[in-house]
Amino acid sequence: MATVISDPDVKRTTDTKGSVVVPGDTSDSNKSSDDTETQRSTHLGSTDDHVFADPATAEYWRLKYEKAGYENRHRFDPELTWTAEEEKKLVRKVDKRIMVWAWVMFCALDLHRRNINRAISDNMLGELGMNTNDFNYGQTIFLVSFLSAELPSGLVSKKLGADVWIPFIMCGWSIVAGSQAFLSNRAGFFAIKALLGLLMGGFIPDIVLWLTYFYKSNELPLRLAWFWTALSTVNIVGSLIAAGVLQMRGVAGWGGWRWLFLLEGIVTLGIGILSWGLMPPGPTQTKNWFRGKNGWFTDREEFIMVNRLLRDDPSKGDMNNRQAVGPARLWLALKDWEQWPLYLVGLTTYIPPSPPSTYLSFILRQIGFSVFEANLLAIPSQFLFAVNLLIISWVSERIKERAIISSLANIWIFPWLVALVTLPATASPWVRYALLTGLLSYPYCHAILVGWNARNSNSVRTRAVSAALYNMTVQSGNIVASNIYREDDKPLYKRGNKILLAICCFNVLLLYGVKAFYIWRNKKRDKQWNAMSREEREYYILNTTDEGMKRLDFRFAH
């Protein structure tokens, strides 16, 4: 009988005597990566042909997990078997316990990232003596602070544990965000934006890394798509809340925008406090005073959870979840240049829709809609945004295609921007609103790219750093985006939209180029791998010091 003893994304088998047998033809790099990934990851229930079926390989990884102090190593069992029904039931349980609360926490983050867009529809800028450019400066300060905190926050989280660090920063940003109710001038606005950026910066990469502790590689992208529906959910719910709360203008002598900041800060502070009890460190660490003395999972469920994750990706056990990424390992992760193309994609891909999204309510106010109407009219685009996000993420995972599917986001945006640039100033406000709604209904590819980045990292060490670096490039792009619409270009922002058109075209070409790059890298590795003898491959598999994406038997997804 043959058994797979593969590291992620490459297929190797052993015969019954345990000698390594590697398929000789891996010239089709996409096939060698994704076909194997599909076989290994999408199958539910245990099989005989898993990575640890060979005793020598199982012992190699057992020693590696012991050396790393992997927190779940006591549940590692190469001989464990389970049924597909058991695994399906367990995944549903993880979704309810882990994914739902991760989504709620993300809503708490995005509520405070986006409520400023609704507050400015209630004359916030005028009451603070500010204009559009001042608002842009504040957004830039927030994003620079957000970006600066990404990597340090990720490193602190890796040392303390996401279950400790994330609730702490959530409580912190809720208090600071609520204090915006007491703003009186531009300087205070800038100071609070800086503090918010520093506190919020590490949340997304930290929570994505935390989710990888519970899900297999093929399960993550679609769940991240559901995770990012928080963006549209918050925009819809936030618009409804704002439509009501902003009517409180005059209560206690306050503007409606002040009440908006205060009340939403109180709500998210409650979510932050609950997160101390609802975030377990990992699959086998759910027992505590809040979650119960028996925890959320039975012993058998813990065994299944740990072994299904490790058989999907053995590298998930090469670090403890309380182990810091030291300077040497950080430098190694930073030097993983083959990950850099994805960072460039993160830098530019989301720029085109960002200014129209940020300024939607403000633009609608400028072209004649009321505060109430401007907030409610944001809802249709957000609903369509969520639908398209789920569709594009599902299609990408279904056909195992990332780059081309991701390019559809900018292809979608392009014609709407062309229409906005060419539309005469005398056109009906409803026509302009319809074009903006169409643009902002684009298929958001962020879940695909985050999953792609995590998959190509191929180790916990690299994944912890690359998640932060990727999100840092995204925030860098947001800094650029926040300064494209300028005071002298309002209310139609035609000059800004022309700039967005050029970036749109660049993004499509970039994604095709990144796909070509990874195909080239895979073919180069195929050539090296196929030039090795069977004995050389066996020795390499069990003795190499190469880690993560540097392994010759690893193939990049694209």
Task: Enumerate the language-model features and the residues they cover.
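Cytosolic juxtamembrane N-terminal segment immediately preceding the first transmembrane helix
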Residues: A2-N115, G126, L552
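Extracytoplasmic
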Residues: R97-T132, S148, S153, G238-A242, ...
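Extracytoplasmic gate region of multi-pass secondary transporters
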Residues: N117-R118, V325-S393, H446, V450, ...
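Central cavity-lining transmembrane alpha-helices of secondary-active solute carriers
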Residues: T140-L155, I379-I391
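Conserved MFS/SLC helix-loop-helix module at the cytosolic interface between two early adjacent transmembrane helices
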Residues: S148-A187
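Hydrophobic core of transmembrane alpha-helices in multi-pass small-molecule transporters
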Residues: V176, G188-G202, W210, P429-I448, ...
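Central mid-sequence intracellular linker of multi-pass
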Residues: N218-L231, V251-L330, R495-E538
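C-terminal transmembrane helical hairpin of 12-TM major facilitator-type secondary transporters
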Residues: I399-L449
